[in-house]
Amino acid sequence: MDVRDAVEADAGRLAELTGAPTDVMRNLVHDRTVRVAFERRGSEGDHEAGGESEGDDSDDEHILGFVSFDAKRETVHITQMEGTDAATRRLLEEPRRFAANEGMSVELLVASGNEAHRSVAETVGFDEEGPGPRFGGTPTVRYRLDP
């Protein structure tokens, strides 16, 4: 599995992962830092896990997941995360690394019923901080990782 910056051409696959319109995901790529985890088709195992890529051969790639984030004040806010458990675990390293380099905390809101994302957050070291805001009536749980 490799990780690279998302590009506009990824919007269709990101829309498939989220159920959101392609235009919304295209705007996400423009407005936030978005990283995608992918595997090259037909070459599984040819690349070391966690590698970096320039992403110049997107037709030969299968996107497994993505994470979007932005930084405000002293906190990196993870705004969206979708994908396989392995991909989301790997992708959470991206905002964590950025935050560590900048001496910032990381915050993640997860829908309270999304056990897969809650488990991934806890597995990679986030601490549950209590309830977060509601989005569209859905309660969330706030997770935080301090430097």
What annotation goes with each model-predicted range?
Residues 2-14:
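A short beta-loop-alpha structural element at the N-terminal edge
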Residues 16-58:
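Active-site rim helix/loop that mediates acceptor-substrate recognition in acyltransferases
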Residues 45, 55-71, 77:
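Conserved beta-strand in the GNAT
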Residues 73, 78-87:
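A short, internal acetyl-CoA/4′-phosphopantetheine-binding micro-motif in the GNAT/acyltransferase core
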Residues 83-100, 119, 123:
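Conserved acetyl-CoA-binding loop-helix of GNAT-fold acetyltransferases
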Residues 99-112:
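Conserved GNAT acetyl-CoA-binding A-motif
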Residues 109, 127-142:
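Conserved catalytic-core motifs of GNAT/GCN5-like acyltransferases
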Residues 112-131:
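Conserved active-site alpha-helix within GNAT-family acetyltransferase domains
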